[in-house]
Each structure stands twice: as structure tokens, then as C-alpha cells.
UniProtKB/Swiss-Prot annotation:
This is Germin-like protein 8-4. Plays a role in broad-spectrum disease resistance. Probably has no oxalate oxidase activity even if the active site is conserved. It is found in: Secreted, Extracellular space, Apoplast. Keywords: Apoplast, Disulfide bond, Glycoprotein, Manganese, Metal-binding, Secreted, Signal. Residues 70-213 form the Cupin type-1 domain. One of its GO terms (molecular function) is manganese ion binding. GO terms for cellular component: apoplast. Coiled coil: none annotated.
Amino acid sequence: MASSSSLYLLAALLALASWQAIAFDPSPLQDFCVADMKSPVRVNGFPCKNPMEVNSDDFFNAAKFDMPRSTMNKVGSNVTNLNVLNFPGLNTLGISLARIDYAPLGVNPPHIHPRATELLTVLEGTLYVGFVTSNPNRLFSKVVHKGDTFVFPKAMIHFQMNLDHNKPAVAQSSLNSQNPGVITIASAVFGSKPPISDDVLTKAFQVEKKVIDWLKSQFWESNY
């Protein structure tokens, strides 16, 4: 019969193995793995560029995060992403960044990041922020000011709104994935291609078909 210490050791090893199995962005197995965007190889992520061809510029991006972006759209916000898709040096490093500009009363509408937790820092202005848990849908919200931070747990529906009627606001988000992904709830439901069946949506939202038709007819503009 195995000793108690052996059983404890086995349990610990199994726990460590299962933790690795459920990790979204696994720890890198080399110093770096700059993404080779031209490679025909398809993997869960991106293959590595030849390390002998890597130079300092692969770890640099002139993101100009100090420059304001246009918020001339229906929602009054603009999200500028810095992730592995436009910064290959982030490949396997499990991190990305975003600048969010808000017009007066602008909104970053309810959305989720399926692969990342988000830490938001307010750089300018005052924001109303919040997230909704899984069922039974509890809301956690807060008014945050310049210098404040707020965290949105992974895959939770969340949002931000600039409360000022006259001044823009700016925030910066850090995310613990090289490619967090984003699903904007309204446009995903009413602007999917091909569209979701009216029968599904009328029952789900408990409204008449004409309401669903009107919502589907809207131009669901992206702020990304």
C-alpha cells in the first residue's frame, strides 16, 4: 500500500498537471517567440520567427498611445489594441494593451474578452464602469476617476461610460493574453452573419418580431 506521503505527492503532481492543462496562455518555454506571421504553419497561437533573425525592433512598437483617437461613431468611443496581431513580439508572453478614448457621454458598450482578465486604469476623466456575473447576473459597478483602477474578470460582460457631458475621457487597459478577443454583445446578437433566427430572438427577448427586425436593421458600428 502506498504511504501517505506518496499519495500526497501524487495528488500534488496531478494538481500541477491539471493547472497547466486549463491555462489559457501557457508559460513560454524559451526566452522569446516572436510571431512569424508569414509562416504557413497553423497552430494554437503563432509559430516562432527564426531566433537568429530576431532583432530589437521585434520588441518595439511605435503605438503612439499618447495620441487621442477619433470617437466620431455611434457609441462615442474608440479602442486601440496592441496585441500579437499588430505586435508579433508579444507572442507567448501572455500580455496585451489597449487605449480607450471616450467622447463626452461616450460608451464602450457591453462586451466580453473570452480569453483574458482586464485591468482598466483611468488616465483622464470620470467613468461609470461595471461587469455582470454569470447567472443570476449580479452587477458590480463603480464610478472611477483619474488614477483609479478597476478589474473585469475573464469572460464577464463589462462596459464603461464617460459621465462628463462636455469633456472626453481616456483609459488604458492591460490584459493577460496576447490575443484576448472581443465579443460586443449587441452586434453579436443582432448583427451576426448569417443572422440568428427571428424565432430564437423573439422568444429569448420576449418581444414582438417587429422589434427584432428593427434591431437587426441597425448598422452595428464597431469601436475597435
